[in-house]
Amino acid sequence: MDGVSNWPAPSTPTPVHATLTIPGSKSQTNRALVLAALATPQGTSTISGALRSRDTDLMIGALQTLGFDVESAGTDSDLRVGGGLGPAAGARVDCGLAGTVLRFLPPVAALSTETVEFDGDEQARARPIAPLLAGLQALGVRIDGDGLPFRVRGEGSVAGGTVEIDASASSQFVSGLMLSGALFRDGLTIVHTGESVPSAPHVAMTVSMLRDAGVEVDDTKTNRWTVRPGPVAARHWTIEPDLSNAVPFLSAGVVSGGAVRITGWPAVSTQPAGAIMAILEKVGAVVRQTESYLEVQGTRQYQGFDVDLHDVGELTPAVAALAAVATPGAVSRLRGVAHLRGHETDRLAALSAEINGLGGQCEETDDGLVITAAPLHGGVWHSYADHRMAMAGAIVGLRTPGVEIEDIATTAKTLPEFPQMWADMLAGQTATDPEAGA
């Protein structure tokens, strides 16, 4: 990538021992921001522990474009949301590469009385959005286009009712419609018609947060969600640490045979905490959870594993990195993630290319990857402007001297502090590993 320097990924021959605090959850932050905006007729909402990253700043900017007031309340991670829906004529929402902005805000714009244009990064134009737009059109919303850039022609209200959509490409189609559904005149019933919805825990998170905002949601029937019409309550939101962003750091404990502790790990969460712990246990790690932290103690040598990541697809790059540096010859199978071909990049093709480019053995399957661990060598690990690809490269680099991450700054999408946090974690560790890959 022109103008982008490579980041030398640190490697270490000694166990990593560290205690870290991870910034707030992107998924919770952006849902709380949308719900706080929709609650403005009832009053001002506040958010504490909000993540500040490119994705959340894009959401803040987009809500401001739609007329809402979003401002810091003492610190960058404490926010106040007020004002009201009222975009100016010619308003344009910049989605960047944020799927939550792309999919959560068209239904909000449909409630306005203006035409709002949506556009984003060039890569975002390849991200799936047509099923959501078709769903809105079926509900009577006027939309020009079926992908970025597109225009939502707001008419001040949305009738609501029942809509059928195929959300097999992204659970955000369901979440995006549900978040605004209570403000549709007749509420909203969503019927999913395709194959299984990926990342189902994120839909459950949306349902939980809607209920926390006083919205009545019925999700008792499989592939059917009903949101009753009514106000969204103004309230205070407390954001948990981003557990997905904790995984690369926990993985450092695994691949180095060390121990990494994450403080503030929630005892109960709508994030996929249980899935993360189960995956780490599959690679032989000892996982210990208390009321105040999660600690993972790893073993530098571990065997392959078989894991279905359909519900936690965002973990795939980190899990693939763990598989790539397992005991040479160990075979791992990652399944259920065909939908990753439509994420920030085609993550399956990208992971295969990068692991193989460093001497590994990675093959794509219809719905995932088969990785046979092999001694790796140094080289450039391309990020594809994908934050999770960059983080995965850092995991590989811990065991492989000479790995350079192209565009480490792309981690700013969800964790701007990543390079410094990674360095802090490794403070005092030897920077080279002459026996890496052995």
Swiss-Prot record:
Entry binding sites for 3-phosphoshikimate: K26, S27, R31, S170, S171, Q172, S199, E314, H343
UniProtKB keywords: Amino-acid biosynthesis, Aromatic amino acid biosynthesis, Cytoplasm, Transferase
Molecular function terms from GO: 3-phosphoshikimate 1-carboxyvinyltransferase activity
InterPro entries: Enolpyruvate_Tfrase_dom, Enolpyruvate_Tfrase_sf, EPSP_synthase, EPSP_synthase_CS, RNA3'P_cycl/enolpyr_Trfase_a/b
Cellular component GO terms, alphabetical: cytoplasm
Protein origin, superkingdom: Bacteria
Pathway involvement of the protein, from the record: Metabolic intermediate biosynthesis; chorismate biosynthesis; chorismate from D-erythrose 4-phosphate and phosphoenolpyruvate: step 6/7
Catalytic residues in the record: E314 (proton acceptor)
Residues that hold phosphoenolpyruvate according to the record: K26, G99, R127, Q172, R347, R388, K413
One GO BP: amino acid biosynthetic process
Localization, UniProt: Cytoplasm
Main EC class the enzyme belongs to: transferase
Family: Belongs to the EPSP synthase family.
Family annotation (PANTHER family): AROM/DEHYDROQUINATE SYNTHASE, PENTAFUNCTIONAL AROM POLYPEPTIDE
Subunit structure: Monomer.
Protein name (record): 3-phosphoshikimate 1-carboxyvinyltransferase
Natural source organism: Mycobacterium sp. (strain KMS)
Protein encoded by which gene: aroA
